[in-house]
C-alpha cells in the first residue's frame, strides 16, 4: 500500500529510507542539514511572532476601556501596560494606539521571518558549512557549539538591558506601588547591591520568604536585570573566546539531541518559575492588569467586611469570631496584627492598597479606624470579587461565584498554562536526554522497523 509518506511521492531527504526518520519525526530529518534546519527554526520564529501580532491586534479590537483588563481575558495587553505603554495613574488605559503599533510591528516581523523560513527550507542551500562557514556547524564540534551558546547568551543579555533602558530612559514602567494606587514612572535609583539581589536566590521558597518570587519593588527588578544582562553578555563573550574544559568535555554529551534536551530542561525551569511569579507576584505582574493574586483576593475580602462592619458599629479590634480567635483582627505566629478568619493563612501578603495601613507591628488599629481611603475600599471590593479561583471550596474563605459568572483570571490562565507546559517540557527533557545518552553509549535501539507487528497485519483496505 502506497501512502504519501512512504512511496515514490516523497522527496529525497524527507522520506524514511533516506533519513532514517519517519515523516512525523519532524526536524529529526534535518539533523545534518544545517541550511534546512535553519529554515525550520526561522519559520517557527515566524509562527511565534505571527501569533503575538495577531493576538495582540485581536485583543486591541475587543478591548473595552471601561472594564479592567483582567475581566476581558487579556494576556498580551497586560504585558504591554506593565511596560508603561498607554496607561496612566491607577492603571487606567489612556491610549490604545501603542498596543496597535505593537501588533502591527509583530505582524510585519513575522512576514519577514516567514519568508526567510520558507526560503531556507525550500530554496536555500541544504547545508551552510561550505558556502557560509561562520553559520555552519557540526554537532560534535565542541568549540563551535560553545561559540553558538555564547552568541545566544549575548542576545539574552541585550534583551535584559532593553527592559533596563525602557525603565530608565524611555518613559519608565508601571509601578503598582506608586503612591495613591499605582502609576508609570522612570526608575531612578537602581538596586545594584549584590547582597540584596543575590540574597533573593538564597531565600527559602516557602511562605513569606518566597525566593526570587518575593521581589516587591521595581528598583530590585530592574537592578536584577542589569546584573543578569551583564552576566549573560560577559558569559557569552567568555564562551565565544574559550574552548570547553576537559571536565566539561567528559561530563556532557555532545550531540544535537543532547543540546535539545538541555534546552528543554532550561525552558521547563523557566516555565515553573514563571508559573509561581504570575501566581504570587503583584509587582512584576500588577493586579491592576492581571487581577489580584489568590492571597490578595482573600485578604481583600477580609478588609472589605472589616470596613463594612466597622461602619455598622462593630469594634473590629476586639470582636471574637466563631472559633474564639479575633473575627476581624488577630495575631500572627510572630506577633503581628493580621486579618482574622480563614484568610489568616495569607497573613504575609503584601499589596499596595493594604501597606499604608500597616505599622511597626502589623496592621495598625488606629489607621484602620481613621485612615482608610476610598480608593483602598474600591480596590479591595473589586479584588474580592475577582479572585483567580475556579474552585468550590478551600479558597481562603473567598466567596466563590456561581457558575453563571463568566470570569477566569489571566493569572489562572498564565499560571496553569506555564505549569503544564513546564511539566511537558520536563518530560521532553527526560525523553531526549535518555535517547542522547543511550546513543552516546552505543545501545540506542529504537523500534525494530523490520519486525514491527503492524507489518504482518492485513491492510485496512
UniProtKB/Swiss-Prot annotation:
Compartments, as annotated in UniProt: Plastid, Chloroplast thylakoid membrane
Family affiliation: Belongs to the PsbB/PsbC family. PsbC subfamily.
Protein name according to UniProt: Photosystem II CP43 reaction center protein
Keyword Nucleotidyltransferase appears in the UniProt entry: no
Gene of this entry: psbC
Membrane disposition: Multi-pass membrane protein
Pro-piece positions: 1-2
Organism of origin: Trachelium caeruleum
Binding site for [CaMn4O5] cluster: 355
Role: One of the components of the core complex of photosystem II (PSII). It binds chlorophyll and helps catalyze the primary light-induced photochemical processes of PSII. PSII is a light-driven water:plastoquinone oxidoreductase, using light energy to abstract electrons from H(2)O, generating O(2) and a proton gradient subsequently used for ATP formation.
One GO MF term attached to the UniProt entry: electron transporter, transferring electrons within the cyclic electron transport pathway of photosynthesis activity
Alphabetical GO biological process terms: photosynthetic electron transport in photosystem II
Keywords tagged on the record: Acetylation, Chlorophyll, Chloroplast, Chromophore, Manganese, Membrane, Metal-binding, Phosphoprotein, Photosynthesis, Photosystem II, Plastid, Thylakoid, Transmembrane, Transmembrane helix
Amino acid at each position: 500500500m502506497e501512502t504519501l509518506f512512504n512511496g515514490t511521492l516523497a522527496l529525497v531527504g524527507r522520506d524514511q529510507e533516506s533519513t532514517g526518520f519517519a515523516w512525523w519525526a519532524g526536524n529529526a530529518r534535518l539533523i545534518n542539514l544545517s541550511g534546512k534546519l535553519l529554515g525550520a527554526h526561522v519559520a517557527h520564529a515566524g509562527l511565534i511572532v505571527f501569533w503575538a501580532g495577531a493576538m495582540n491586534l485581536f485583543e486591541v479590537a475587543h478591548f473595552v476601556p471601561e472594564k479592567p483588563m483582567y475581566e476581558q481575558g487579556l494576556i498580551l495587553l497586560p504585558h504591554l501596560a506593565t511596560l508603561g505603554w498607554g496607561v496612566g495613574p491607577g492603571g487606567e488605559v489612556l491610549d490604545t494606539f501603542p498596543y496597535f503599533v505593537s501588533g502591527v510591528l509583530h505582524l510585519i516581523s513575522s512576514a519577514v521571518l516567514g519568508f526567510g523560513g520558507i526560503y531556507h527550507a525550500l530554496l536555500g542551500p541544504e547545508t551552510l558549512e561550505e558556502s557560509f562557514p561562520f553559520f555552519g556547524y557540526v554537532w560534535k564540534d565542541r568549540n563551535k557549539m560553545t561559540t553558538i551558546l555564547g552568541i545566544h547568551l549575548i542576545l539574552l543579555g541585550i534583551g535584559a538591558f532593553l527592559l533596563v533602558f525602557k525603565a530608565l530612559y524611555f518613559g519608565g514602567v508601571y509601578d503598582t506601588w506608586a503612591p495613591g494606587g499605582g502609576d508609570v514612572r522612570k526608575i531612578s535609583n537602581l538596586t545594584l547591591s549584590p547582597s540584596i539581589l543575590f540574597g533573593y536566590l538564597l531565600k527559602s521558597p516557602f511562605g513569606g520568604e518566597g525566593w526570587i518570587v518575593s521581589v516587591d519593588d521595581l528598583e530590585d527588578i530592574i537592578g536584577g536585570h542589569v546584573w543578569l544582562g551583564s552576566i549573560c553578555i560577559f558569559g557569552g563573550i567568555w564562551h565565544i573566546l574559550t574552548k570547553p574544559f576537559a571536565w566539561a568535555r567528559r561530563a556532557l554529551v555532545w550531540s544535537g539531541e543532547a543540546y535539545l534536551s538541555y534546552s528543554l530542561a532550561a525552558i521547563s525551569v523557566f516555565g515553573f518559575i514563571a508559573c509561581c511569579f504570575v501566581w504570587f507576584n503583584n509587582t512584576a505582574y500588577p493586579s491592576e492588569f492581571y487581577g489580584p493574586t489568590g492571597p490578595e483576593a482573600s485578604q481583600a475580602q477580609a478588609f472589605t467586611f472589616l470596613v463594612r462592619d466597622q461602619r455598622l458599629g462593630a469594634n473590629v479590634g476586639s470582636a471574637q469570631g466563631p472559633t474564639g480567635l479575633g473575627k476581624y483582627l488577630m495575631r500572627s505566629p510572630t506577633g503581628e496584627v493580621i486579618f482574622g478568619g480563614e484568610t489568616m493563612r495569607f497573613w504575609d501578603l503584601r499589596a499596595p492598597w493594604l501597606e499604608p495601613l500597616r505599622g511597626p507591628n502589623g496592621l495598625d488599629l488606629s489607621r484602620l479606624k481613621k485612615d482608610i481611603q476610598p480608593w483602598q475600599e474600591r480596590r479591595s471590593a473589586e479584588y474580592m470579587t475577582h479572585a483567580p479561583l475556579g474552585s468550590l471550596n478551600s479558597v481562603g474563605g473567598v466567596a466563590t461565584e456561581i457558575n453563571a459568572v463568566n470570569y477566569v483570571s489571566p493569572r489562572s490562565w498564565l499560571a496553569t498554562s506555564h505549569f503544564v507546559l513546564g511539566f511537558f517540557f520536563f518530560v521532553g527533557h527526560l525523553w531526549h536526554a535518555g535517547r542522547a545518552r543511550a546513543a552516546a553509549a552505543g545501545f540506542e535501539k529504537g523500534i525494530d522497523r523490520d519486525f514491527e507487528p503492524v507489518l504482518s497485519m492485513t491492510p485496512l483496505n
